[in-house]
């Protein structure tokens, strides 16, 4: 916030200048984690500026902060360190996406399809219904000490990650 304070009282009038920036981004929804087709995903909220299809198949990192019930917080970033996994939003191969190919360009990938692939390894237990989702949550808990309920008190976004190149 910036302000210039004038000489006259505000009752005599003032000028107000307001601005904002467009910051294209994907944030995670409050309950983002789900399993589909033996893969775990995060559901996202899309905030505009760039076309939705430009988010697909690019390397993404996850940045955020979890606020625990006791008020403490955990900051984290996954995907920036060279030993971290790098994430992406999947897309169909052209020869498999006939329905998608028939859509106009602006609808090539819909906002509700911008889901981040987060895991593919399952817990080794045939009795577990969502074994990949459970394993993803176990890994997040072991590394960051977070639980699924804490996503409700989290601010998490997806950012493009790649080294600059000529």
Task: Kindly label every feature range from the protein language model.
Residues 13-98:
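A generic, well-ordered mixed alpha/beta core segment in the N-terminal half of proteins
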Residues 36, 84, 103-138, 144:
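Glycine-rich, flexible beta-strand/loop modules in the N-terminal catalytic cores of phosphate-handling
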Residues 90-91, 97-112, 165:
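Structured, contiguous alpha/beta core segments that scaffold functional sites
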Residues 140, 157:
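Aromatic- and glycine-enriched pocket-lining scaffold segments that form the walls
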Residues 145-156:
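Flexible, glycine/charged-enriched surface loops at secondary-structure junctions
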Residues 160-166:
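Conserved small/polar residues in nucleotide/adenosyl-binding loops
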């Amino acid at each position: 916030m910036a302000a210039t304070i004038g000489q006259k009282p505000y009752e005599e009038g003032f000028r107000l200048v307001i601005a904002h920036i467009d910051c294209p981004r994907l944030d995670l929804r409050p309950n983002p984690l789900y399993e589909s087709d033996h893969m775990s995903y995060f559901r996202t909220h899309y905030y505009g500026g760039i076309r939705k299809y430009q988010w697909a198949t690019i390397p993404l990192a996850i940045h955020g902060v979890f606020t625990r019930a006791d008020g403490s917080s955990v900051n984290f970033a996954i995907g920036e360190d060279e030993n971290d996994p790098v994430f992406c939003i999947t897309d169909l191969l052209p020869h498999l996406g006939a329905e998608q190919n028939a859509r106009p360009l602006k609808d090539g990938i819909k906002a509700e399809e911008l889901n981040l692939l987060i895991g593919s390894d399952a817990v080794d237990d045939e009795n577990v219904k969502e074994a990949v989702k459970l394993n993803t949550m176990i890994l997040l808990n072991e590394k960051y000490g977070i639980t699924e309920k804490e996503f409700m008190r989290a601010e998490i976004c997806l950012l493009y990650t790649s080294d600059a190149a000529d």
